[in-house]
Amino acid sequence: MNETRRVRWIVRVGVWLIRALASTWRMETVNGEPLAAARRSGQQVLFALWHGELLPLLWHQRGENVAIVISEHRDGEIIAQIAESLGYSTVRGSSSKGGSRALIGLMREIDAGRDGAITPDGPRGPARVFAPGAVVAAQRTGALIAPIRASASRAWRLKSWDRFLIPKPFARVTVSFGPLTSVVADSPRAAAEHAPRLQAILDAVPGS
């Protein structure tokens, strides 16, 4: 089996498994009204989420005209195709490879009218350390950063750098939003200095 066919097969099976598993979850949203109000007013947002909580958050925000940054490594191709099957637009790149191109692509997607999403600690960590790409994109586009976290009443944890969270069947999955946060700065370099503040805000949101 060549690589293209292998990836296509993994994606097809993965999407089926995710839909089957996630359809059993009991979803609960906490503090979602500020996001809804911002969207009603036409204000765009940039979701910031830790990589380890990606799966339940991909499911929660599916089909909502969101462009998400996915890494360019081989596993990223599988994740990108799964995300696209759930209704996301994808921008390829990361902080370690293709980062500038990914940031430009994300800003173009936001300028085109989509919300954005980024894992500021992805794709390889260190876990829960907020890289500056999200704050630079928010400063350049005027999007508000929407911190978003997930937790589950019962879950598996992978033995990966991010301790990837997979809620078990019929788990109660809680998606919590932090305060929508603007990034006001005179330059991208000045915007990047806001990263520790955004890390503290994201860490303060209840999650796994």
Give residue spans per PLM region:
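Short, well-ordered alpha-helical scaffold segments within catalytic/effector domains
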Residues: 32, 51, 76, 100-107
